Amino acid sequence: THKKARNGRLRQGLIDKKSATNHFLVVMSDVVVSPPSKDQTADLVARLHAVGLRSTRQRLALAALLLDGRHRHVSADSLTREIQDSGTQMALGTVYNTLNQFTDAGLLRRVTVHNEHSVFDTNTDHHHHFYDIEQDRLYDIPAEQVQLAAIPDVPDGHNIEAVNVLIHISSQRD
């Protein structure tokens, strides 16, 4: 188990006791990923708690990658590869669950690009997207650059919650 592995590393002197008590420390298999600074960890813990999420190791590891202020678009698969490339093991299901929890909490925005393929956007401000179908890549479009000429009447008993524009693009061919 993780506790036994951590305690074994403590005895072997591979990690110091102070960092072992930091609950952000990600210990998966035999790999130890260094945590962010105490201030960064405290900020991530506060952000998660502010939206009603507990600060588990997995959530903190993903929050450190996603909530660092950079605007990015990630899929569960690409994020899992990024985590594994850093030497940390995390199940794809855990990544999916955490992305969905972050989305439900308003920390991320889901963009469904086609039937069963969603991309998660760290920019939660209102904006739209170009989707490059050849590169499987999203590009942000500022909301003010999209003008809607007319919106049909909403069925009785309903309100418009949001309008999200996704424009599919491909490379120009001569």
Show which residues each predicted segment covers:
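C-terminal regulatory/oligomerization modules of transcriptional regulators
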Residues: 2-6, 14-40, 144-174
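Short amphipathic alpha-helical elements of helix-turn-helix/winged-helix folds
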Residues: 47, 64-69, 82
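Non-DNA-binding regulatory cores of transcription-related proteins
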Residues: 105-174
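DNA-recognition alpha helix
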Residues: 75-88
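Short alpha-helical segments that sit at the start of domains
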Residues: 31-61
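Short helix-capping/hinge SLiMs at alpha-helix to coil transitions
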Residues: 53, 68-72, 86
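Basic amphipathic alpha-helical segments that dock to polyanions
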Residues: 95-102
